[in-house]
Amino acid sequence: NTEWKSGLLIEEKLHSELFNYATSNTTFEELYYHMNEFIKKCGYLNLDFNGNLGHSIVKNKNHRIYIENGNKKKLGNVKYFTFEPHISLPNSDYGYKKENIYYFNNDKLIEL
């Protein structure tokens, strides 16, 4: 299915864009706006019910912070974070989600 394959490729493209855009000084909010705009430019919708794209990795899930509007914390201020865009084409039967964990080492983004 061409549409299905295209969705999987867009997920890869989104994770590549994370490497192109994110620095340890990028805020969770800046990443939220950049990646949501990138998703739209690719012709897709963000399906997450809260609109976020991932979160910090912490022992207590109640202490998570999210890649969302209003979060001014810098990516480099957390030990690990997920990037997990949940996307779809408008009016499609398919949705896509790829989740990876990332961290910074000397300002270089690393995929766990």
PLM ranges: what are they?
Residues N1-L112:
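Active-site neighborhoods and metal-handling regions in enzymes and metal-associated proteins
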